[in-house]
Amino acid sequence: YDDRWDRMTTWDFFKRRLVRLHPMVIMGTLLGASLFYFSACSAFPMVMQTPWWNVLLMTLLGCLMFPTPTSWDIRGWWETNALNGPTWSLMWEYIANVLYALFIRRFSKLALGIFVGLSACLTLDVTLNIDTFGLLSSRGEAAYTLIGGWSLTPGQLYIGISRLLYPFFMGLLLSRIGKLVKVKRGFYWCSLLVTVILVMPRIGGETSQWMNGVYEAVSVLALFPLIVAMGSNVTGKRSVALCKFLGELSYPLYITHFPLIYMQIAWARNNPDAPAGMHLFIAVSVFVLSIAIAYACLKLYDEPVREWLKQHWLMKKNTKTSK
């Protein structure tokens, strides 16, 4: 949005972001509510104890993107939205959008570079378990990782902020610099690199947990920005078409897939003696169904709703002005 501020007010920006993001927030929450009781298992001990009216209340709060405290949890994972966990990171994106519109868009490259360095220190503080502010002592198995950020507790809020700031400032700085790494078939190489990075299991044993912290820090601070720089210059016709499709699908997939994951976890807990082949079948089915639901939501709901909001809300001011 850096190149649009000469023809867009701050309120226009907020409306554009709401139109882009919020319809699927509502859809993801409604999907999570409809499948909530199908996720009952020992991993989610509170599900069957939750009355229907409480689910309806959480649905309303989720649709409004109102983060709930841990005392209001109805699942057992203390998420800000117990019906659709991934919205915790979207909450941070909303905050980043507000800060960008009010202040950060005016930052120079030097200022962005300084904030990149400062936010990198926060990333290192979490991944290496340095715990400068004394907020990470209760992380347990999540120590030396970036796992966390989805609860309204001091430690989780700190992890959430740490996970937000470096990618946000680094992404904005890369966009401002505009110098991309030109690699032939860069999209495919970048896809391979992302896959390799993400499939790596946790490294280091109980006495060498720091090794995993170093791996995650290097991945976030160096490898992911490099991949973005390498993959942002796609020119091939097929590559552009594939990128366009995946880009359109990514947000609906992100915001709708987790209710199915809850159900998969419940099935695995409730069927501990199921053969490996059945687990594989369930996993593949969840993968395929997640993509199908995301694509259906995109074409049948998200795009039509956004177009309607664009015509009746975003462009309403311009129409009145022209009249």
Question: Language model features by range: what are they?
Answer:
Residues 28, 32, 100, 290-298, ...:
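Alpha-helical transmembrane segments of multipass membrane proteins
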Residues 1-12, 68-78, 102-109, 146-295, ...:
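Alpha-helical transmembrane segments in multi-pass integral membrane proteins
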Residues 319-323:
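Intrinsic disorder in cytosolic terminal tails and internal cytosolic loops
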Residues 12-13, 21, 89, 112-113:
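Alpha-helical transmembrane segments and their helix-entry boundary regions
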Residues 17, 21-25, 249-256:
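Loop-to-transmembrane-helix entry motif
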Residues 21-94, 123-154, 218-231:
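Membrane-interface helix-loop-helix regions
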Residues 34, 117-131, 192-205, 264:
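Aromatic-anchored segments of alpha-helical transmembrane domains
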